[in-house]
């Protein structure tokens, strides 16, 4: 009889625990897309977007207060009165502030290939400058912080060479790319609007400073019969 009683008890416990199994499921793609294209600046915004009543990870303040009052009441009845010891205050934990997608000042190191790709015996001054670039993170990894409007400006830098045992200085123009506006777009979408021309430009062509000529076909040389 005892064995059957234990089996019955285990079956009842399993019936209560079984609904909790399998609660964790894969996040729907629809939810990921909604998070990616929504403006979220705080945990409260995320809570409202997900339509969640409460945030997990902490105890309800009212329940904690009632429990502490009951504990103090029983403690005062059983334990004799002692000197009051100053209690340490709990450190308040601040909410994380997202690094939103926007333009920020970054340090751009001028590449030597942009000054003179044929030589290596020279110095650049200044070696780096400040530019505005799109930085920050988006709500999900499916989108990326990218520039939607850019601007180009030229600056003068000094190229120092050592010719015939004497330093030689030459001013060289360097074209810098600056970002004016940013947006969270898909990683595959890397085109943006240029402020000066109004055309869509590929970032790879802007960084190298080289443009491809289109509409010209190379003529093949005809071989003369021997």
Swiss-Prot record:
Sugar-modified residues: 139
Propeptide regions on this chain: 23-91
Molecular-function GO terms, alphabetical: growth factor activity; platelet-derived growth factor receptor binding
Superkingdom in the source lineage: Eukaryota
PROSITE patterns (alphabetical): PDGF_1, PDGF_2
Compartments reported by the entry: Secreted
Disulphides: 101-145, 134-182, 138-184
Keywords recorded for this protein, A-Z: Cleavage on pair of basic residues, Developmental protein, Disulfide bond, Glycoprotein, Growth factor, Mitogen, Secreted, Signal
Gene Ontology CC annotations of this record: extracellular space; membrane
Signal peptide: 1-22
GO biological process: angiogenesis; platelet-derived growth factor receptor signaling pathway; positive regulation of cell division; positive regulation of cell migration; positive regulation of cell population proliferation; positive regulation of ERK1 and ERK2 cascade; positive regulation of phosphatidylinositol 3-kinase/protein kinase B signal transduction
InterPro entries in the record: Cystine-knot_cytokine, PD_growth_factor_CS, PDGF/VEGF_dom, PDGF_N
Disulfide bond is among the record's keywords: yes
Subunit-level organization: Homodimer; antiparallel disulfide-linked dimer. Heterodimer with PDGFB; antiparallel disulfide-linked dimer. The PDGFA homodimer interacts with PDGFRA homodimers, and with heterodimers formed by PDGFRA and PDGFRB. The heterodimer composed of PDGFA and PDGFB interacts with PDGFRA homodimers, and with heterodimers formed by PDGFRA and PDGFRB.
Function: Growth factor that plays an essential role in the regulation of embryonic development, cell proliferation, cell migration, survival and chemotaxis. Potent mitogen for cells of mesenchymal origin. Signaling is modulated by the formation of heterodimers with PDGFB.
Entry-linked PANTHER family: PLATELET-DERIVED GROWTH FACTOR, PLATELET-DERIVED GROWTH FACTOR SUBUNIT A
Family listed: Belongs to the PDGF/VEGF growth factor family.
Domains (record comment): The long form contains a basic insert which acts as a cell retention signal.
Name under which the protein is recorded: Platelet-derived growth factor subunit A
Name of the gene: pdgfa
């Amino acid at each position: 009889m005892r064995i059957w009683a234990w089996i019955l008890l285990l079956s009842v416990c399993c019936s209560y625990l079984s609904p909790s199994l399998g609660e964790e499921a894969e996040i729907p793609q629809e939810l990921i897309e909604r998070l990616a294209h929504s403006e979220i600046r705080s945990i409260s915004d995320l809570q409202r977007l997900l339509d969640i009543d409460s945030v997990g990870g902490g105890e309800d303040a009212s329940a904690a207060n009632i429990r502490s009052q009951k504990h103090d009441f029983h403690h005062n009845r059983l334990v004799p009165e002692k000197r009051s010891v100053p209690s340490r205050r709990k450190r308040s934990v601040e909410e994380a502030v997202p690094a939103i997608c926007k333009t920020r000042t970054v340090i751009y190191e001028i590449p030597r290939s942009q000054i003179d790709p044929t030589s290596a015996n020279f110095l650049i001054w200044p070696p780096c400058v400040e530019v505005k670039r799109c930085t920050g993170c988006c709500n999900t990894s499916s989108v990326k912080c990218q520039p939607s409007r850019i601007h180009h400006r030229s600056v003068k830098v000094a190229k120092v060479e050592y010719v015939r045992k004497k330093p030689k200085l030459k001013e060289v123009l360097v074209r810098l790319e600056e970002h004016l506006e940013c947006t969270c777009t898909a990683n595959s979408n890397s085109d943006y609007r240029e402020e000066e021309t109004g055309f869509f430009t590929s970032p790879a062509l802007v960084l190298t400073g080289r443009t491809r000529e289109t509409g010209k076909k190379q003529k093949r040389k005809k071989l003369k019969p021997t």
